[in-house]
């Protein structure tokens, strides 16, 4: 098969204000940053930036803990990192599920040797605090309560 001669040109859409659920407008500052050269995670400049980020996180959380760090990975990797460092075999963990990522938390808890005590809510609804209180009363030996603040699979926020 022979491809027809194509007139390849740059794609330059006209500027718009996006008002739907996504994608959303990106600020000029972010667009400029996205056009910057890519740094690898072992590049000295990247490591320097991560060290500065660590200092800022220590300030925000008012800690001098040397183990403070930002995770240079997707959110799921950060979640798994937390569980792997906090859960010991047999720990009870109250896990709230109202979307995909609550289920992923359950999987992580179980992979780390913990027992997931599930508090299930309808997908797309915030976590029901009364259910969490009931789970805490039924399982006072639970060492962790875990929930997804912004459940991106359903677009719901839980506080």
Sequence positions of predicted segments:
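Conserved N-terminal alpha-helix of the aminotransferase class I/II PLP-enzyme fold
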Residues: 33-81, 100, 104-110
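Active-site phosphate-binding strand-loop segment of PLP-dependent enzymes
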Residues: 127-159
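Conserved PLP-anchoring active-site segment centered on the Schiff-base-forming lysine
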Residues: 87-103
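Active-site-proximal loop->helix
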Residues: 104-115, 122, 133-135
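N-terminal "arm"/small-domain region of PLP-dependent enzymes with the aminotransferase-like
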Residues: 1-43
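Alpha-helix C-terminal capping segments
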Residues: 84-89, 111-112
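Short beta->alpha connector loops at strand-helix junctions that form conserved
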Residues: 97, 119-122
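Short beta-strand segments
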Residues: 72, 120, 146-149
């Amino acid at each position: 098969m022979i491809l027809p001669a194509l007139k390849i040109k740059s794609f330059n859409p006209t500027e718009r204000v996006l008002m739907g659920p996504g994608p959303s407008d990106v600020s000029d500052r972010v667009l400029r940053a996205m056009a910057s050269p890519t740094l690898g995670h072992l590049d000295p400049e990247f490591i320097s930036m991560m060290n500065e980020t660590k200092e800022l996180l220590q300030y925000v959380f008012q800690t001098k803990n040397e183990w403070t760090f930002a995770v240079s990975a997707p959110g799921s990797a950060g979640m798994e990192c937390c569980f792997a460092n906090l859960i010991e075999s047999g720990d009870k963990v109250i896990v709230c599920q109202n979307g995909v990522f609550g289920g992923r938390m359950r999987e992580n808890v179980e992979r780390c040797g913990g027992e997931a005590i599930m508090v299930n809510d309808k997908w797309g609804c915030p976590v029901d605090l009364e259910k969490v209180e009931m789970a805490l009363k039924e399982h006072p030996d639970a060492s962790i309560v875990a929930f997804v603040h912004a459940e991106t699979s359903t677009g719901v926020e839980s506080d």
